[in-house]
């Protein structure tokens, strides 16, 4: 017991003794304190009540009107109110170290569940819906007050703490493939696309249609199969499967044509059919899914506005992230067939195997307590109260295990599913609430060989959405320098990035950048003119850009050339 100031738990039991009496001016309290050595100290003392007579009369009138009895004058703040909303959803947080509670509360926000009951009708930009969310067996009182149980964000997993062939080292987890096939942790990702008939000056406008079916000529038409899944109005058929991952070219989501980009393109527009551009909307690169809903409405300027939702099934796979409510996060390292998974004497096969090394150094005792509590709750068909400071105690949970024929330690004898031999050591197993987080490997997987570059720096674009290159940073460069792999450095940082042949004037030490004049078909130095001694130098375009930016500041950088030896 800690009697100091700032303690989270009130060590005293307070009893009001004279509340039923009339015209009380002071309250008599009986305070009982249980000391750590087991002895109880009892004291009685009085407190003056800061009530005016009118307040007491008002309370008495309320008593008569509501037929209630005034049983208290003061309310003590509950101990769990020192926690925030997310932290109060974590069971037994007082048994964890502070960083783990903080990490657990951060991941509660990332868990998948049911974001809204009308998600089929809401055109949100992105939505992620778990198929079968469950209420947690071990919960807290805050779950009722926050209505978390009406829209939960996870599922109850049968978990065993053991390693298997090293596939769950470094926080990875091993998952039962049969559980995944029975829709454990399965979710759907929904993305909304917006297409609009934009209007331009001069009466020109975009048209949502199947390109190439009208009277106008269309530049940049795709193959006929690319538009085969579109209806006559240019919109896709619901429940049509679209993909950018396979060879079939069916990534067109909305067929659309636009007027010529520049007026020069509209040559002969009055003499012949107008020429238009193909500007269909495609689904995002690297994604696939089914057309879920198509909403057609009007935009603010009375144009046609279309909103299409795409639905993608997200089945747990290698690399997907799962986490308990105690900051124990990890990605799937292996999916194991049901017949190869370990099983208990009762034939229970765990859904998840986590590594024993994840527990001791992190001191997440609440993770272990919740596994025991989930085991008792699932056997006795009741919920376990894991509210901070006042939840069901460990002794009660151990007694519940004994009542149901289990070892009070939570450990069980398990058999190797691959060899049929019983493990020499007992394995700790239980039921715990796990969350699937929205960090999915399918939405992060990215590779590139060749692709587009930026206009300014002529280096590869950045980011998965723009099909960008993978950054070769300073530390990677330093590794190659330490290896002495100079040709690899040149290949990565120059040839495969922004290599550039720069023309440099060497006429009497000029050192300025020259250029090639296509009209006169000769190299020209802006300082020396046509009759200049120009040489090609291989460098990066970023260096050439630096020289140009220095010129804009009024600083002329001159390059000195030497013969290569």
Model-inferred region functions:
Residues 1-565:
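Conduit-forming functional cores of very large proteins
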């Amino acid at each position: 017991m800690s009697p100091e100031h700032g303690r989270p738990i009130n060590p005293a039991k307070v009893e009001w003794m004279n509340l039923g009496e009339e015209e009380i001016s002071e309250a008599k309290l009986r305070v009982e304190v249980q000391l750590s050595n087991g002895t109880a100290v009892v004291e009685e003392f009085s407190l003056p009540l800061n009530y005016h007579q009118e307040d007491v009369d008002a309370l008495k009138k309320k008593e008569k009107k509501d037929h209630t009895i005034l049983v208290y004058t003061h309310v003590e703040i509950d101990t769990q109110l020192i926690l925030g909303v997310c932290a109060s959803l974590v069971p037994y947080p007082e048994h964890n170290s502070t960083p783990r509670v903080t990490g657990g509360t951060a991941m509660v926000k990332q868990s998948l569940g049911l974001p809204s009951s009308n998600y089929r009708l809401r055109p949100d930009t992105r939505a992620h819906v778990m198929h079968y969310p469950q209420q947690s067996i071990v919960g807290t009182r805050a779950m009722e007050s926050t209505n978390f149980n009406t829209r939960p964000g996870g599922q109850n997993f049968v978990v065993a703490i053991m390693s298997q062939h090293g596939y769950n080292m470094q926080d990875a987890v091993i998952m039962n493939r049969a559980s995944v096939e029975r829709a454990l942790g399965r979710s759907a990702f929904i993305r909304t696309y917006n297409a609009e008939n934009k209007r331009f000056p001069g009466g020109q406008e975009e048209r949502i249609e199947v390109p190439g079916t009208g009277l106008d000529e269309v530049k940049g038409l795709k193959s006929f199969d690319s538009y085969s899944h579109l209806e006559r109005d240019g919109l896709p058929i619901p429940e049509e499967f679209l993909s950018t991952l396979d060879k079939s070219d069916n990534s067109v989501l909305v067929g659309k044509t636009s007027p010529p980009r520049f007026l020069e393109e509209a040559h002969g527009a009055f003499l012949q059919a107008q020429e238009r551009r193909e500007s269909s909307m495609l689904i995002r690169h690297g994604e696939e899914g089914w057309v879920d809903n198509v909403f057609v409405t009007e935009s603010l300027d009375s144009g046609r506005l279309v909103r299409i939702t795409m639905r993608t099934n997200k089945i747990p796979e290698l690399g997907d992230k799962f986490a308990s409510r105690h900051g124990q996060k990890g990605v799937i390292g292996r999916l194991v067939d049901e017949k190869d998974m370990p099983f208990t004497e009762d034939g229970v096969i765990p859904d998840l195997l986590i590594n024993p090394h994840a527990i001791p150094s992190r001191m997440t005792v609440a993770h272990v307590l919740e596994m025991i509590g989930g085991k008792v709750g699932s056997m006795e068909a009741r919920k376990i109260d894991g509210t901070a400071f006042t939840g069901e105690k460990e002794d009660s949970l151990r007694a519940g295990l004994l009542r149901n024929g289990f070892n009070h330690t939570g450990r069980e004898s398990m058999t190797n599913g691959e060899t049929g031999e019983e493990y020499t050591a007992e394995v700790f197993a239980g039921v715990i609430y796990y969350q699937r987080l929205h960090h999915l490997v399918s939405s992060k997987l990215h590779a590139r060989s060749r692709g587009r570059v930026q206009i300014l720096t002529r280096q590869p674009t950045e980011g998965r959405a723009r099909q960008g290159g993978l950054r070769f940073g300073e530390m990677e460069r330093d590794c190659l320098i330490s290896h002495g792999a100079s040709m690899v450095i040149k290949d990565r940082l120059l040839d495969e990035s922004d290599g550039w042949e720069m023309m440099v004037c060497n006429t009497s030490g000029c050192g300025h950048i020259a250029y090639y004049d296509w009209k006169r078909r000769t190299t020209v130095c802006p300082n020396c003119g046509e009759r200049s001694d120009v040489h090609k130098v291989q460098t990066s375009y970023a260096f050439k850009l630096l020289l140009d930016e220095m010129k804009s500041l009024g600083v002329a950088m001159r390059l000195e050339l030497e013969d290569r030896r």
